[in-house]
From Swiss-Prot:
Additional comment: Heme 1 (or BL or b562) is low-potential and absorbs at about 562 nm, and heme 2 (or BH or b566) is high-potential and absorbs at about 566 nm.
Compartment annotation: Mitochondrion inner membrane
GO biological process: mitochondrial electron transport, ubiquinol to cytochrome c
Residues that bind heme b b562: H83, H182
Cofactor note: Binds 2 heme b groups non-covalently.
Mode of membrane association: Multi-pass membrane protein
Residues the entry annotates as binding heme b b566: H97, H196
Family designation: Belongs to the cytochrome b family.
Protein's name according to its UniProt entry: Cytochrome b
Cofactor(s), names only, from the UniProt record: heme b
Organism: Sylvilagus aquaticus (Swamp rabbit)
This protein's record includes keyword Heme: yes
SUPFAM superfamilies the UniProt entry points to: a domain/subunit of cytochrome bc1 complex (Ubiquinol-cytochrome c reductase) (SSF81648), Transmembrane di-heme cytochromes (SSF81342)
Gene3D superfamilies hit by this protein: Cytochrome Bc1 Complex, Chain C
């Protein structure tokens, strides 16, 4: 008698995705981030659902409803901080996942990669809209500044911004629609994740060497289910350490002041996970140029597969590219630091240099390094 998991129409899908899936035998811990992102998404949807039960999306009561959640709801403080810091863990895993893709050449799976870029944009949009909801000072001014960037679009910009706001400033209409979108987007993300996995399972996983591993595959269960479970434990431990010991470590003190349209905070800055893009935006003195650079800082990921000039897929055996990739990581950390600093010298110059370096590494230096390494191979 054949096993029910191999014959049942629904269980068959689960079986082919999580149990009998042929997986390369040498994938490292860098391949754990996909499943960790799945866990983050589940945590965010569940905590978000419980927060939505007590939250009110009205400018007069939004701030006090969040206070009410933290003070009066059973374990409301825990749910709220799990959700807020869960977002930080989500982005840590996202950036690691994308970095892994760049380092090991996973971007050659074009469909998977492009769906991944769409997912990244969707998660960033969701995080931004969720950031506005508690209606504190930085939440409000962050929303005002970032949505206002769209006014840089020629001809239709101002109309577009007022259309998004639902008025002439960030107000009740904006808050209500942001709450609606923030609620629906995670489910769209979950659907996109399914498509992402569908395309991945068409080709199978890449591995650190970048060499096809068809001759050496092992079943996903039990080998990688247990490995993922270890990753889950590590992630949950980190998240709980953050939530239970310093829940406000990554937040902004300004957000404990209710939103006031008449009082601008001295330094407007987004959450830490957007600081690198914010630094790139600020390093260009022209508004439209800054907005284009901001969009390109993420959209550049779509160009990476076109610039893959190396004869090898992974960077595992390419020392020059390896150095460049780690310089890119250092550069992104520098940009993140600069994004949180006030706009004055020397930070302006450092930000501009780091921004130029960011685009140079991806567009010029990495393809050049690949060509040099190809030459070295011939010698």
């Amino acid at each position: 008698m054949t096993n029910i998991r191999k014959t049942h129409p629904l269980l068959k899908i689960v079986n082919h995705s999580l149990i009998d899936l042929p997986t390369p035998s040498n994938i490292s811990a860098w391949w754990n981030f996909g499943s960790l992102l799945g866990l983050c998404l589940i945590i965010q949807i569940l905590t978000g659902l419980f927060l939505a039960m007590h939250y009110t999306s009205d400018t007069l009561t939004a701030f006090s409803s969040v206070t009410h959640i933290c003070r009066d709801v059973n374990y409301g403080w825990l749910i709220r901080y799990l959700h807020a810091n869960g977002a930080s863990m989500f982005f840590i895993c996202l950036y690691m996942h994308v970095g892994r893709g760049i380092y090991y050449g996973s971007y050659t799976y074009l469909e998977t990669w492009n769906i991944g870029i769409i997912l990244l944009f969707a998660v960033m949009a969701t995080a931004f809209m969720g950031y506005v909801l508690p209606w504190g000072q930085m939440f409000f001014w962050g929303a005002t500044v970032i949505t206002n960037l769209l006014s840089a679009i020629p001809y239709i910009g101002t109309t577009l911004v007022e259309w998004i706001w639902g008025g002439f400033s960030v107000d009740k209409a904006t808050l209500t629609r942001f709450f609606a979108f923030h609620f629906i987007l995670p489910f769209i993300i979950a659907a996109l994740v399914m498509v992402h996995l569908l395309f991945l399972h068409e080709t199978g996983s890449n591995n650190p060497s970048g060499i096809p591993s068809d001759s050496d595959k092992i079943p996903f269960h039990p080998y990688y289910t247990i490995k993922d479970a270890l990753g889950f434990l590590a992630l949950i431990l980190l998240l709980l350490l953050l939530v239970l010991f310093s829940p406000d470590l990554l937040g902004d003190p300004d957000n404990y002041t209710p939103a006031n349209p008449l009082n601008t905070p001295p330094h407007i800055k987004p959450e830490w996970y957007f600081l690198f893009a914010y630094a790139i935006l600020r390093s260009i003195p022209n508004k439209l140029g800054g907005v284009l650079a901001l969009v390109m800082s993420i959209l550049i990921l779509a160009i990476i597969p076109l610039l893959h000039x190396s004869k090898q897929r992974s960077m595992m055996f390419r020392p020059i590219s390896q150095v460049l990739x780690w310089v890119l990581v250092a550069d992104l950390l520098t940009l993140t630091w600069i994004g949180g600093q006030p706009v004055e010298x020397p930070f302006i110059t450092i930000g501009q240099v780091a921004s130029i370096l960011y685009f140079s590494i991806i567009l010029i230096l990495m393809p050049l390094a690949s060509l040099i390494e190809n030459k070295i191979l011939k010698w």
